[in-house]
Amino acid sequence: MAKVNLIESPYSLLQLKGIGPKKIEVLQQLNIHTVEDLVLYLPTRYEDNTVIDLNQAEDQSNVTIEGQVYTAPVVAFFGRNKSKLTVHLMVNNIAVKCIFFNQPYLKKKIELNQTITVKGKWNRVKQEITGNRVFLNSQGTQTQENADVQLEPVYRIKEGIKQKQIRDQIRQALNDVTIHEWLTDELREKYKLETLDFTLNTLHHPKSKEDLLRARRTYAFTELFLFELRMQWLNRLEKSSDEAIEIDYDLDQVKSFIDRLPFELTEAQKSSVNEIFRDLKAPIRMHRLLQGDVGSGKTVVAAICMYALKTAGYQSALMVPTEILAEQHAESLIALFGDSMNVALLTGSVKGKKRKILLEQLENRTIDCLIGTHALIQDDVIFHNVGLVITDEQHRFGVNQRQLLREKGAMTNVLFMTATPIPRTLAISVFGEMDVSSIKQLPKGRKPIITTWAKHEQYDKVLMQMTSELKKGRQAYVICPLIESSEHLEDVQNVVALYESLQQYYGVSRVGLLHGKLSADEKDEVMQKFSNHEIDVLVSTTVVEVGVNVPNATFMMIYDADRFGLSTLHQLRGRVGRSDQQSYCVLIASPKTETGIERMTIMTQTTDGFELSERDLEMRGPGDFFGVKQSGLPDFLVANLVEDYRMLEVARDEAAELIQSGVFFENTYQHLRHFVEENLLHRSFD
């Protein structure tokens, strides 16, 4: 089937007035290849040309004023080809001096007693406006587009095309296209939405702020609705082929394993285990997200599930994003399982004969549980009968990587784990219909980490506090944002310089260095020394953000903490507080922005990762929270997942009803269904 368009035009781009081969090249750089693309190329913002009352105008604000010229314009030249034109206006009985730099031609256009409209920066003290645009009344020649356009669309453009040109070309296109409605009359009436025709025309040429708000609301809902139709349809297709073998685990053996654990499970852990076990008994494949705050005990839950698979005769796989984390998981699971399970580690560092033997053992089921990095998804990694695939910190992998691991078993159950609690909005968008288990309870005996914020000039006091902890036999992390100094970020501390400074302070043998440029063997050596308490202080970049577990570490200093988002800061902080000893986290930062100050304040107020994830999403937006490409989120033109989260839930419910009821597959939705199928359904946002 050919590509289905919801916007159809009788013309090609080349047939539009003002578009030739050179313009086509520029438009293609803007990803505009068809008339439909042009119509859907929406403004990034709007310039407000509404004339303002000067009595209400704030000093140094950008304003639009209208007044009568009462002195002839005067031009003064200075420097090399520079000029300054001065003219005086009477604006509602207020004498205003207008200055235009490097626009001497305006002298011939502005006449005495003429009414003109000026846009520029207002100086309240001097009663002066520095103009950047001027509109003349109907008696004069207009130097810009008509000032009657109160809201002027502004587009992202490139060299070779001007704002006026793209506005004119979009206006031409809108006059001739046929726009098929994306929403039914019933949906539009139910949620008081506009037609797509009105919406697109208004987004490009708004007549009022009220119209623009209505159009943006309609388009935002439409984007979210189409996205959710795609998600719900994919879920339907996935579940239709989601038969699974029932995992007939030995409950008595599992209970015995839990009883042998050196600690008692929290109620949240027990609840999560029960939810996962119910999924394993179900006739369809499990798709579950296990989310829990740092140190909440997700790995133990995963271990119990792996053990259950072993009792049923199946293998398990655990994929993590880094080698350090893979090694730590392997160590902790081997300690938990003892001789009851054969655990193996496969990373990029495992090569040659060792790798060959491991793969043979995996295929003949000598290995019960395989832990590794993306090396697990390589073609030569063949399981005998894998029944459970676990992906830790799953948002750090692309959708395709996760799918490849899942396909290692024909009827494999899938468990995703994350220590970055997912805000509800993103959970709906990224994980769709996936079931979610949450561990919001920390193990008994854990004390909340005391977090404080210090300015750079208080560094010596922080150092004294860290030294006090070291004297108690504890260990400490020191985190920096950069590996080496940068000429672009001269005021940001780098890990190498701080490492050398602390070596001088504490002695060379007591301080270790960890960063991403070290080889896997070098990282492993440093981490082993820190884990074995051969070094007291580990100076590191964010490579320790996830998973590193050293219970004796009770102090963390994060240098230039304002350079990190809330979720990253919280993950870093989670490296301490992993025992019954009191732990401390000190944020060293002198933020210059309100956002930076707010982040530091929030971090000192709460240690709740779920609350922090919501605040982080509000401050950074969904694109930065995961990274759009990593998360599978589309880049919406109008919709905002933070601001429009209620609308997202409504769109999701409506899409789910259409798909699940089967109404979407009736003739009424034929055009929209073909559009979603041909343009969205199998599109990857990775």
UniProtKB/Swiss-Prot annotation:
Alphabetical keyword list: ATP-binding, DNA damage, DNA recombination, DNA repair, DNA-binding, Helicase, Hydrolase, Isomerase, Nucleotide-binding
Record field: catalytic activity: Couples ATP hydrolysis with the unwinding of duplex DNA by translocating in the 3'-5' direction; ATP + H2O = ADP + phosphate + H(+)
Motif DEAH box mapped to chain: 392-395
Keyword Magnesium set for record: no
Helicase C-terminal domain residues: 462-618
Any GO molecular function: DNA helicase activity
Its EC number(s): 5.6.2.4
GO biological process: DNA recombination; DNA repair
Sequence positions that bind ATP: 292-299
Start and end residues of each Helicase ATP-binding domain: 279-439
Region of interest called Wedge domain, as start-end residue ranges on this chain: 50-149
InterPro entries assigned: ATP-dep_DNA_helicase_RecG, DEAD/DEAH_box_helicase_dom, Helicase_ATP-bd, Helicase_C-like, NA-bd_OB-fold, P-loop_NTPase, RecG/Mfd, RecG_dom3_C
Top-rank lineage group of the source organism: Bacteria
SMART domains: DEXDc, HELICc
EC top class, as a word: isomerase
Database matches in SUPFAM superfamilies: Nucleic acid-binding proteins, P-loop containing nucleoside triphosphate hydrolases
PANTHER family given in the database record: ATP-DEPENDENT DNA HELICASE HOMOLOG RECG, CHLOROPLASTIC
Function: Plays a critical role in recombination and DNA repair. Helps process Holliday junction intermediates to mature products by catalyzing branch migration. Has replication fork regression activity, unwinds stalled or blocked replication forks to make a HJ that can be resolved. Has a DNA unwinding activity characteristic of a DNA helicase with 3'-5' polarity.
UniProt free text on domains: The wedge domain within the N-terminus inserts into the replication fork junction, where the lagging and leading strand split.
Family that this chain belongs to: Belongs to the helicase family. RecG subfamily.
NCBIfam families reported in the protein's UniProt record: PRK10917.1-3, PRK10917.2-2, recG
Subunit structure: Monomer.
Stated name of the protein: ATP-dependent DNA helicase RecG
Species the sequence originates in: Staphylococcus aureus (strain MRSA252)
Gene that encodes it: recG
